[in-house]
Regions:
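Amphipathic alpha-helical assembly/interaction segments
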Residues: 1-214
């Protein structure tokens, strides 16, 4: 399996064609010890999280007061969401367990950030958009464009009031959460079916031993 940011409906990844095992001549052809992973930058979940970070950094510094601890908290949560997806993708080469753990940390960090944005609106008696409102549906359509970059949303950051920007961030976080949830389900399934590095090492050794005996 390889993650691909262009295929969100399939859980942020696409299935690649496998080699015909009957034509293999070495254990490495049957199973790679370190399976390939796609570039984390192609992950749609990472792209969304990076946009959320860029929006949050600007939002917090522009609309929250100096000395407000929420500034650092929101920026750190946004950064954690982005960085843990990145680090999880890199860790995938050697440890599915670590990849799964870091991806879960990313999910939890974005959930904290989501709560901070909702707190901002609630404390000021400002509405959170209904998920089926025309505004939310517009952001959802914008969220289907690939790649997802801050430039898609820059105009809103420059021209819209803070309550609109906060709601856009909420929409994007919810989209990122959905993608990460699909990613986690895939990782859990992959771990159950294939195990981690230790299991792969065992299978490769057995395949090599069987080949020498045949």
């Amino acid at each position: 399996m390889k993650y691909d940011g262009k295929n969100a409906k399939n859980g942020n990844y696409v299935k690649q064609d496998s080699h015909n095992s009957h034509s293999s001549h070495s254990p490495e052809d049957h199973e790679r010890l370190l399976p390939p992973r796609g570039d984390y930058q192609t992950l749609l979940s990472f792209q969304k999280a990076e946009v959320v970070y860029d929006i949050t950094f600007r939002f917090a510094h522009k609309y929250l007061g100096r000395g407000d601890r929420t500034v650092d908290q929101m920026i750190q949560s946004a950064r954690s969401g982005k960085k843990n997806i990145l680090e999880g993708s890199k860790a995938a080469l050697t440890s599915k367990e670590t990849e799964l753990k870091l991806t879960n940390v990313a999910r939890a960090s974005l959930e904290e950030l989501l709560d901070d944005y909702k707190d901002y609106l609630r404390a000021r008696d400002l509405p959170v958009w209904d998920k089926n409102s025309k505004e939310a549906l517009y952001v959802r359509r914008l969220g289907r464009k690939t790649p997802q970059t801050y430039e898609l949303y820059r105009e809103f950051m420059d021209t819209r009031p803070p309550e609109v920007i906060a709601n856009i961030a909420i929409c994007l976080i919810c989209q990122a959460d959905y993608l990460i949830d699909q990613q986690i389900k895939h990782l859990e399934k992959e771990f159950i079916e294939q195990g981690g590095l230790r299991e792969r090492m065992t299978r490769v050794r057995l395949a090599y031993r069987n080949q020498k005996q045949s």
